[in-house]
Curated annotation (Swiss-Prot):
GO cellular component, one term: nucleoplasm
PROSITE patterns, per the entry: ANTENNAPEDIA (PS00032), HOMEOBOX_1 (PS00027), HOMEOBOX_2 (PS50071)
PANTHER family: HOMEOBOX PROTEIN HOX-A4, HOMEOTIC PROTEIN DEFORMED
Short motif Antp-type hexapeptide, span: 128-133
Localization of this protein: Nucleus
UniProt cross-references to Pfam families, sorted A to Z: Homeodomain
CDD domains per record: homeodomain
Protein name: Homeobox protein Hox-A4
Source species of the chain: Heterodontus francisci
Regions of compositional bias (Low complexity) in chain numbering: 217-233
InterPro entries: Antp_homeobox_Deformed_sf, HD, HD_metazoa, Homeobox_antennapedia, Homeobox_Antennapedia_CS, Homeobox_CS, Homeodomain-like_sf
Superkingdom, taxonomy of origin: Eukaryota
Residue ranges of the region described as Disordered: 206-247
Organism classification: Eukaryota, Metazoa, Chordata, Craniata, Vertebrata
Amino acid sequence: MTMSSFLINSNYVEPKFPPCEEYSQNNYIPSQSPEYYERPRDPGFHHEALYPQSNYPEPTYSFNNVQGTGNQDMSQRGHVQSQASLQNHIPRQNQLCEVVPVATPALCSQNAKNPTAQKGTLSKEPIVYPWMKKIHVTTVNPNYTGGEPKRSRTAYTRQQVLELEKEFHFNRYLTRRRRIEIAHTLCLSERQVKIWFQNRRMKWKKDHKLPNTKMRSASSSSSTSQQTQVSSQGPQPDGSAPNSSSL
């Protein structure tokens, strides 16, 4: 009652739509066939106009005949389908086999004869030019062939220098056994310990203004050679002794 009274008393106006003809003229609604508006039918329904009735009489069927014919039809269909599937698969396999390239004996023989060429094509070694090599010389030597570079200087740590100074304070010359022990203790090579002690001895002699040991040994060897020459000459005929200044 409330809804009906509301609709009667209210100023509600029903919407007015244009007729379908205007929509069809403006191509809003496509024209449909009369079958479009008919009731839906079962899928088993056959229209008389589409499927005309045949004139020959329909044969009678029994349950056994229907079952036997059905089995035969199914077997025939399955046989036909299996043959069709086999025929479809066989050309595909043939196509796949044809696509795969086959290595000819000529190519195999070439690869066997030239394994180095095949490796070169796979991985090329980087080219090192002469200007890329490090040269530790003051002037450019044209005859330099890029041999072993100059050894870099060893950077001793403070702990290593302290231990070497302690050892030098007690022993300026090391035996081979002691040198090996120090090298193992300080994680250095025997050569590095030997060079450090040589440089430290040179510095100590320079600080104490002592003559170089090598220069002293050279001068002593020259004096001994002179003495041997004088003694080998013997006395002169006039009986005078040889003068050292004349020699």
